[in-house]
Design a protein with these regions (language model features):
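Catalytic-core region of carbohydrate-active enzymes that cleave or remodel glycosidic bonds
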Residues: 34-37, 128-172
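Active-site mouth of glycoside hydrolases
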Residues: 1-129, 139-140, 147-149
Length: 172
């Protein structure tokens, strides 16, 4: 599996570091599409390559402005418009990558199922939904939701308990 972070941790545009990626920006789009297609072209014939993966919880970067993890804003979904731009760009990259390499599946890496409704609408050409899941003992409704709402295979790109107390040896 070969992963491109797709702007998750910021990027440099015209020599200026942008810590929070704005996926609707024309220069950002151009850079990310260029890098993703270059990756596909460079590695398409690599023996043992399972799939290409774009991103790493990029949906969380839509509202987390720094290194500190904050609560996900459930009521205030200002990030929804930004999410739509991001997932459209993911799909556009996948289409361009498939034009270069039709032999490998293309996946995105989402933080759990946040914005799954938008993923289903905007990422129709993605082959596999990669997801980082920290729900604890069970994956809950994850399989049912993805099957019903998106209909694509799921790849656990990370999983585990949300928090583990080393003293009590239990989940927090």
């Amino acid at each position: 599996m070969l992963n491109h972070y797709f702007g998750r941790y910021g990027l440099t545009i015209d020599g200026v570091w942008k810590p929070n990626t704005e996926y609707s920006d024309a220069k950002t789009r151009e850079l990310l599409l260029k890098e993703a297609t270059q990756m596909a072209a460079e590695y398409k014939d690599t023996k043992g390559l399972l799939l290409f993966l774009l991103g790493n919880e990029n949906n969380y970067g839509l509202f987390w402005d720094g290194a500190e993890t904050e609560n996900i804003p459930v009521k205030d979904r200002k990030s929804t418009a930004r999410a739509r731009s991001m997932y459209k760009l993911f799909n556009e990259a996948v289409v361009k990558m498939k034009a270069i390499d039709s032999n490998h599946p293309m996946a995105i890496c989402n933080g759990d199922l946040l914005f799954l409704d938008i993923v289903a609408e905007e990422c129709k050409d993605v082959d596999v939904l990669g997801t980082n899941v920290y729900r604890g003992v069970s994956f809950g409704d994850l399989f049912e939701r993805v099957k019903k709402e998106y209909g694509k295979p799921v790849l656990f790109t990370e999983f585990g308990s949300d928090a583990f107390n080393a003293i009590t040896k239990q989940e927090d």
